[in-house]
Amino acid sequence: MTENEKSRSLPAERNPLYKDDTLDHTPLIPKCRAQVIEFPDGPATFVRLKCTNPESKVPHFLMRMAKDSSISATSMFRSAFPKATQEEEDLEMRWIRDNLNPIEDKRVAGLWVPPADALALAKDYSMTPFINALLEASSTPSTYATPSRPTAQKSETSEGEPESSTSATTTSVARRTRQRLAEHLENSKKTILQHDNKEEDKEIHSEENETKDEIKSEKKEPEIKKQEGGSSTEKVGQPSSSDDKAKGSTSKDQPSEEEEKTSDIQDRKIKTPIKPSLLGKIRSSVNKGMTDVASQVNRGMTDVASQVNKGVNGVASQVNKGMNGVANQVNKGVTGVASQVRKPVGKLEKKFENLEKSIGDTLKSSIRSSPKSKKRSREDFEENEDYNAMVPVKRSRITKLESEVYYEKRKVRALGGIAIGLGVGAILPFLF
């Protein structure tokens, strides 16, 4: 190991994609894509291979120039060590400049090395199959390759890779908006022109009618003069046959005044010049339409907001009314259940009081009835009588009272459980 290799230290965390350096590289060749990029001094072809990191969604691309097969060492390092710091990348690029033969190209960014140096780096980075596939891939662009960019400096990353810019989408959106505005302006122009043409047609028709009336009046005047002049004027005014023929020939050659006026009117219909005030009208109509649309939108928004507020307030009032009604019903149910429970409890309390009184009375009567303790003689006991059978009266009465109290307690518990069940059953429908 040389001193340069000792001073070189690669990052510890590698891309898990590059595990086995002995894989077959032939399946990776179809994944390579060729692309032509336009530069100021001419087009250049690049071959790229997309290598994804299994631990992240950010892809990396290995790049190769088609003209000399040089490979981007920067893209190799970043793909092999995606979590490396900028200092580690700078140290590795410095080591490559000192120990390998980098190629300088001002058109692309990053550090590029020839194929032999790229294969040496691939061994260190454990990515030999990917570099072999990139070197063997064809440099002819496929039919589905991305289009070339107009400028190279803006469309390249620090790895020498063209960026996926969104300029195409923005330009398409701008074109669509321009087309829509142009269509709107054309429609407004058409409406205004139609209106103006209608007015001009009305004026032209009125002029035609006036000219026709003038022609008719001109025709009627000589007829009236002829009638007033009599036969003498008719004889004088009658032209000869030769004159009639000459006039007929001239009338055929030269158009009449009526024909000239109608032709002028038709020319005016065909060649109607656009007035310079049309642009002002178009602009004013467009501005009016935009202001009307904006006012309508604002009105609609205010109406929607007011309706939403009204609906929210109505829902809130209905919810409050419903909650108050439920609370009142629950209170009524609780009071009713409490009154129903209190009745059997009062009865039980009275029974307990009666039992206590009866127990006290029995105890007092037993105490009064029992004689004072006297020493009995042996003669009072029979010889064959069992001692255990001789139970005092006091003890038997107490046991009976205890058993009665026990059974009464059980009854009270049962009644309490029934009352609680009835109360819960009455409250649950109001809660759910």
UniProtKB/Swiss-Prot annotation:
GO MF term list: DNA binding; telomere-nuclear envelope anchor activity
Cellular location(s): Cytoplasm; Nucleus; Nucleus inner membrane
SUPFAM superfamilies associated with the record: DNA-binding domain of Mlu1-box binding protein MBP1
GO biological process per UniProt: cell division; meiotic attachment of telomere to nuclear envelope; meiotic telomere clustering; meiotic telomere tethering at nuclear periphery; mitotic telomere tethering at nuclear periphery; telomere maintenance; telomere organization
Key words of the record: Cell cycle, Cell division, Chromosome partition, Cytoplasm, DNA-binding, Meiosis, Membrane, Nucleus
Basic and acidic residues biased stretches: 180-228
Membrane topology: Peripheral membrane protein
Ranges for region Disordered: 1-21, 139-283, 364-384
Positions with biased composition (Low complexity): 139-152, 163-172
Domain of life: Eukaryota
Biased composition (Polar residues): 229-241
Domain annotation HTH APSES-type: ranges: 38-147
PROSITE patterns (UniProt xref): HTH_APSES
Positions of the DNA-binding region: 73-94
GO cellular component terms listed in the entry, alphabetical order: cytoplasm; membrane; nuclear envelope; nuclear inner membrane; nuclear membrane complex Bqt3-Bqt4; nucleus
Protein's job: Connects telomeres to the nuclear envelop (NE) during both vegetative growth and meiosis. This connection ensures clustering of telomeres to the spindle pole body (SPB) when cells enter meiotic prophase.
Protein name: Bouquet formation protein 4
Originating species: Schizosaccharomyces pombe (strain 972 / ATCC 24843)
Gene expressing this chain: bqt4
